[in-house]
């Protein structure tokens, strides 16, 4: 085993034509676009690349599907030179480079929380809505299992992570508080991520809101809160 971090790069391809573009390129994909499109989250495929190194050896790339953004995306991992060649081929295919800001917008549009921004060590998985993809209900004992099982079988959490459409307004700061709609001043929620969303045609935010709250105040505006699951 050796650390290959400095020798490895990755590129993510996002969009409705992403799978088809990857399949068209000279990567020797073992699966076609339709198989990529139906792959489960985190599913890996080995890809034999057309790129050769100085020794004439075929480089190997790996592609994994992610549902962390909208639309779905695929991330390709491999040697730096091979990934650089893939990047150039994607540009030639008409792909447009985008940075972390765009990725963040697509993530919020997908309603996917990220650790360190929307979650921390004090967040319960049911609060963040990640139980289905982050908790194994059949696994043996693990730290926090009793709490998870108790919530699942006999209770509920008092807050939920929600995606909130704020409209065509100046973007509020991360951490901005949501207050009760009755004007009492009671804090009923807090924003964790805020982005400008072309899809929503305005500001889109993620934040935790107390269970049962359907409307809240953000400054002098009323924000509609999606219903509890």
What does each model-identified segment do?
Residues 22-26, 87-88, 119, 175, ...:
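Short, charged, solvent-exposed linker or helix-capping segments at domain edges/interfaces
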Residues 123-124, 128-229:
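Glycine-rich, small/acidic residue-mixed loop/short-helix segments
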Residues 1-113:
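Acidic, low-complexity central loop/insert segments
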Residues 75-165:
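Anionic-ligand-binding alpha/beta catalytic cores of soluble enzymes and soluble regulatory domains
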